[in-house]
Design a protein with these regions (language model features):
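Short, flexible loop/hinge motifs at secondary-structure junctions
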Residues: 1-85, 158, 208
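RNase H-like nuclease fold core
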Residues: 3, 118-122, 130-217, 224
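Mobile genetic element proteins and their domesticated derivatives, centered on retroelements
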Residues: 28, 68, 97, 111, ...
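Short, positively charged, Gly/Tyr-enriched micro-motifs
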Residues: 35, 52-154, 373-375
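Short helix/loop capping segments that flank catalytic or ligand/cofactor-binding pockets
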Residues: 37-40, 76-79, 165-167, 183-185, ...
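Short conserved beta-strand segments at catalytic cores or DNA/RNA-binding microdomains
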Residues: 67, 100-107, 169-182, 229-232, ...
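Conserved beta-strand -> loop -> alpha-helix junction used to position metal-binding or nucleic-acid-contacting
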Residues: 210, 219-253
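Acidic/histidine-rich catalytic cores and adjacent linkers
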Residues: 211-213, 252-408
């Protein structure tokens, strides 16, 4: 696009190319002269790629019967444990189905059509569900490893969105750390989920919106919270759009003060750290000064506050003002909850297409697959390769791979 740097796909290395097609002119294309000289210059190159015809390798395992004269019985050699665990679909096909179900948001009907039209095989939707459940079992250990790690994190962003299970209302919670993201589906949207996942002694900073569950968790267990300033801005813009002139002016002053703080943040790379820290603290103090000073107020004959919106905003800052500025002194946490909201977007898309789950196994499968897909995206890893490695380890009764990158 105009004004944007040009991006070109890097050329395939020569070692990866299987077929070369050379073209040479026998005569000049303009005048027809046959006396042409080949130049010692590299050729123009146009590269292509194509998928081979999908060939399904079919295998058969045979166990022959033997008759034992001692016990008078027929015996068969046991099949290898990995073969029994695999069933009809071996590890790569199992990983592919799980990948399509999660990354591609494909329904079982869509996957069945893929198997029919591309692989020329027929399977039922029920069998495909069992295949995905095998992949889910393979991902249990990596998921549990992250679940146990969450209470130890120094900074977490949390959000929640609705989820349907058998027509019932559930909630998908997202916990985003620096190196990974974890999804948990629960019946409740209350603080109990935070308590179950993070415990009573969570010592990090929790980035979240202003929802009541976070308030309760914060107050019950003295948790440090960074409330989302983006949500705060939306509420302040509502004040600035009200018909009451004093309330509107109050909202506009608050917006201007917050805008000044974000201007400081945007110039972070141009400012030395001590000066940046001082500028942030000054911007914070100015916001609190505006929020708590000159708050419009008018009481009716019964002593009830008539400018309720401004009153509630000022009370929010009195009670929780500090929780909007933890990012100033806490590395790894930002002023907004955008990280968690971004992580949950593909789950919302999946919900729209697949229409939710139908029981505990389905919820567990979604939790684990979403966690793998989201974490691999953060780390620049292939979700398919991770699912394949986990499935392979599961079938072979080997330790599962980890979603935590090796450090050091």
């Amino acid at each position: 696009q105009p004004g944007h740097p040009r991006h070109e796909r890097p050329a395939f290395p020569e070692a990866d190319i299987k077929n070369f097609h050379d073209y040479r002119l026998d005569a000049c294309p303009e005048c027809g002269n046959a006396e042409v000289t080949f130049l010692d210059q590299p050729p123009r190159v146009l590269q292509q790629m194509e998928i081979e015809e999908v060939i399904v390798r079919k295998e058969e395992h045979r166990s022959y019967p033997v008759w034992c004269e001692g016990c008078q019985k027929v015996h068969y050699h046991p099949f290898p444990e990995a073969v029994v665990k695999e069933g009809l679909f071996k590890e790569r096909l199992t990983a592919l189905v799980a990948y399509m179900k999660s990354v591609d948001h494909a329904s079982f009907s869509t996957i069945r059509k893929f198997v029919r039209d591309v692989m020329n095989e027929k399977v039922s939707r029920g069998y495909l569900r069992k295949v995905v459940e095998k992949a889910s079992a393979a991902l249990e250990a990596p998921y549990e490893e992250l679940l146990k790690r969450l209470p130890l994190e120094q900074a977490l962003n949390v959000d929640e969105t609705g989820h349907k299970d058998n027509g019932g209302k559930f909630w998908t919670w997202v916990f985003r750390a620096e190196l990974y993201v974890l999804f948990k589906i629960d019946k409740t949207r209350g603080s109990k989920v935070l308590l179950d996942v993070l415990g009573e002694e969570f010592d990090g900073v929790l980035g979240c919106d202003y929802f009541s569950a976070y308030h309760k968790y914060m107050s019950d267990f003295n948790i440090t919270v960074q409330f989302c300033i983006a949500h705060l801005i939306r509420d302040i813009k509502f004040l600035a759009g009200l018909p009451d002139a004093e309330t509107r002016a109050y909202g506009e002053r608050l917006l201007a003060a917050i805008k000044a703080m974000f201007k400081v943040i945007h110039h972070r790379d141009e400012t030395d750290p001590p000066a940046f820290q001082r500028a942030l603290e000054q911007a914070r103090d100015r916001i609190l000064e505006v929020a708590l000073g000159e708050v419009p107020s008018r009481l009716d004959a019964n002593g009830k506050e008539m400018k309720r919106e401004a009153f509630n905003m000022a009370r929010r800052f009195r009670e929780n003002g500090k929780a909007y500025f933890e990012f100033i002194t806490t590395p790894g946490i930002g002023p907004t909850n955008n990280l968690a909201e971004q992580a949950v977007r593909f789950v919302v898309l999946d919900r729209r297409i697949t229409q939710g789950t139908r029981g505990l196994k389905g919820r567990e499968t979604c939790e684990r697959l979403w966690t793998v897909v989201g974490t691999c995206a953060m780390q620049g890893r292939s979700a398919f390769e991770f699912i394949l490695a986990a499935v392979r380890a599961h079938f072979r009764s080997e330790p599962a791979p980890s979603l935590l990158p090796a450090l050091g």
